[in-house]
Amino acid sequence: MGNKKIVLAYSGGLDTSVAVKWLTDKGFDVIAACMDVGEGKDLNFIHDKALQVGAVESVVLDCKAEFAEIFVGAALKGNLMYENKYPLVSALSRPLIAKKLVKVAKEKGATAIAHGCTGKGNDQVRFEVAIHSLAPELEVIAPVREWHWAREEEIEYANQNGVPIPADLDNPYSIDMNLWGRAIEAGVLENPWNTCPEDAFFMTNSVEDAPNEPEFIEVEFKEGLPIALNGKIMELHEIIKEVNIIAGKHGVGRIDHIENRLVGIKSREFYECPAAITLLKAHKDLEDLTFVRELAHFKPVLENELANLIYNGLWFNPATKALIAYLDETQKVVNGIVRIKLYKGLATPIGRKSTNSLYSEKLATYTAADEFDQAAAVGFIKLWGLPTQVNAQVNLK
């Protein structure tokens, strides 16, 4: 009887490379699976390295389009920002990665899935809750959480077992990156008084180094999702990639956040999210043009709930599914074009138009072209204020 098969979420870094050897020693045949969600890594290198360190099979899946359309798409439709600051960069990718891990496990006949998360962060929760939501029968193993090694011990184990040490191991920061942005933590950032050194950034210029002239872009939306950039029809993941480059050049999207983690601690996180910040602002601006007042006022309440659900690893919870269905209904009118000014760290919508626009210049103008019936205001004010007036008559004695 052969070894049991396990699918490992493989990144090519030290932790998951050591995990291949560690799991092999535990009696597993390791199938390494790497999901490309736009982190810009050399996937051929990762594929080959997995085999080099002992995986019996290496699988690389291009998930950029699905990640953009389904997961980032929901974030855009919902204007999702955890604690009104963090656009859910890592949190959005975890359920997709978990979904693909389960798919590979079922296709390969694996009985377990492994990930490289520590026991201190949010991602362990996101992965394991998602996996058990999709395949309760699968065992989940977290080698890094189990072995409790210091970094020096891990390096010693790697050297003893012929596991290559990554060239960037001396990088003091912990980095996670995908299409929607880049998360930076650890190192000097663990002291919340310290500013983030410029060498930690990759996607964005500093405001000081950003161009001294503004740049203008136009984003076209259809039912809440971008479909064109500067008049060119593109796939959503292509639009995001291009806006990351353009807005990042102008220093847009740097976020310094003291974050309340799911596991109960506060963490200090830096994010680079040029496309996320730019497209979220454009999307919200178009909603302001096309939503009735009641929807514009109510939707943010549910947006906050949905952001919390996704941050907390509950993408596959029925509540999340219901709220995303609500978002889809609201977005039917969010069609049009938004013009955005990019300059010195700011993405500012400066123009918008839509066939679903509820703005009427004839009603809003103060010129002779005004069609608003101002005489009707007298009766409206009387009825609108009637409850307050009655309360005053009864209680102000």
Swiss-Prot record:
Chain residues that bind L-citrulline: 86, 122, 126, 174, 259, 271
Any idea which positions bind L-aspartate? 118, 122-123
Q: What's a single GO BP term from this record? A: argininosuccinate metabolic process
Pathway it belongs to?
A: Amino-acid biosynthesis; L-arginine biosynthesis; L-arginine from L-ornithine and carbamoyl phosphate: step 2/3
- According to the UniProt entry, what is the EC number of this protein? 6.3.4.5
What keywords would UniProt list here? Amino-acid biosynthesis, Arginine biosynthesis, ATP-binding, Cytoplasm, Ligase, Nucleotide-binding
Which InterPro entries does the UniProt record give? Arginosuc_syn_C, Arginosuc_syn_N, Arginosuc_synth, Arginosuc_synth_CS, Arginosuc_synth_type_1_subfam, AS_cat/multimer_dom_body, Rossmann-like_a/b/a_fold
Q: Which GO terms describe its molecular function?
A: argininosuccinate synthase activity; ATP binding
Q: What is its main location?
A: cytoplasm
* Annotated HAMAP family: Arg_succ_synth_type1
Please give the family membership noted in the entry: Belongs to the argininosuccinate synthase family. Type 1 subfamily.
Record text on subunit structure and interactions: Homotetramer.
NCBIfam families xref list: argG, PRK00509.1
* Stated name of the protein: Argininosuccinate synthase
What phylogenetic lineage does the species belong to? Bacteria, Bacillati, Bacillota, Bacilli, Lactobacillales
Encoding gene, per UniProt annotation:
argG
